Structures are given as C-alpha cells and as structure tokens.
Amino acid sequence: MINVLAVAGLPGSGKTTVARIIERRGYLYYSLGDVVRAEAERRGLTPDKTAVTMRLERGRKAVIYELLKSVKPGEKVVIDGIRSIEEVEALEEFLGTVFLIYVVASRKVRYQRLTGRGRSDDPLSFSQFLLRDLRELRFGLADLLSRADYIIVNETKSIEELEQEIGKVLLELR
C-alpha cells in the first residue's frame, strides 16, 4: 500500500478539493501553500514573493523540507501543492513511494475559480493570473505532468464525480 499521495496542478485546477477528498478517506492533510503563507506572514511578505525567496535562499526543496518537519514516516498523508520533481524526490527520500496525482483545468475555468475564492493570494487581474502561472511553471510544475501516476481532468466535474473518481484510484492503491 502506498501511504504518500501528492497532488499537483496549476492554481485553480482543484488540487485542494482533490486533496481534501483524499483526507476524508483517512489520510492526514498537509499543504505546501499553508507552509508558504505562514512563512509569508512571519516575513511580512506576500505569499508569491515568499515562495520565490524561500527557493532562492534554500533551493527548490526548501518548502517541502519545511513541511517534512511535521510529517512522521509511516503516516498515511496527502500533500497538497507539490511544485517540482525535486519536491517529489524529497518526499520519496524521507517517506517512501509517492503516488502523484496531477489535476488539470483550462485557463478560463481556473481563473473563474480563483477570482471567486476570496483568498488573499488570489489574482486581482487576468495579467496577474498569467504571471502567477508563469511563476508556478518556472518552479517545475510542468515537469510533474510526465511524472504523474494519475491525471484528473477537472473542467466541469461535480464534487460527487471527483469523489467517485478518487475512490476508484484509492481502491487501486490498496
């Protein structure tokens, strides 16, 4: 059985929704975005600047190393917001085999989701949205698509449809 599930995808793709469904199936939930937002608050910076700064200061694995301080080997965990192959490798190094789920949705759908979410780090304009996508892709997010063990196309799926799909995936992992 695989105990470590990682969820990746561009902002607004539905990563957190997928990860929270997995959490309800008995996995402990951890968010790399929460790590960045907490560090941003501590530093007095925006989450976007903090994500870049952490990686510039301590390398591409900086955020995952911070998160790993809270995770115990052997726990069933879902990690929300993986950004690079290096982060997956760090998880594998400390926790064992990782099953990577990549969530995709169109630019239009993702922008609509983000502007309706109400989080402080959501884009205020379409140009900000595009810049955020570029930043995320520079972290190595696109490279994860070829490493994905499972891809969810989350364009128009209801929560119930996502729950059914994820349930089937988790059954196969047993």
From Swiss-Prot:
Residues that bind ATP: G9, L10, P11, G12, S13, G14, K15, T16
Keywords: ATP-binding, Nucleotide-binding
Coiled coil in keyword set: no
InterPro entries: NTP_hydrolase-rel (IPR022970), P-loop_NTPase (IPR027417)
An example Gene Ontology molecular-function term: ATP binding
Family designation: Belongs to the UPF0200 family.
PANTHER family with a match to the protein in the record: DEPHOSPHO-COA KINASE (PTHR41930:SF1), UPF0200 PROTEIN MJ1399 (PTHR41930)
Name recorded for this polypeptide: UPF0200 protein PAE1629
Species this protein is from: Pyrobaculum aerophilum (strain ATCC 51768 / DSM 7523 / JCM 9630 / CIP 104966 / NBRC 100827 / IM2)
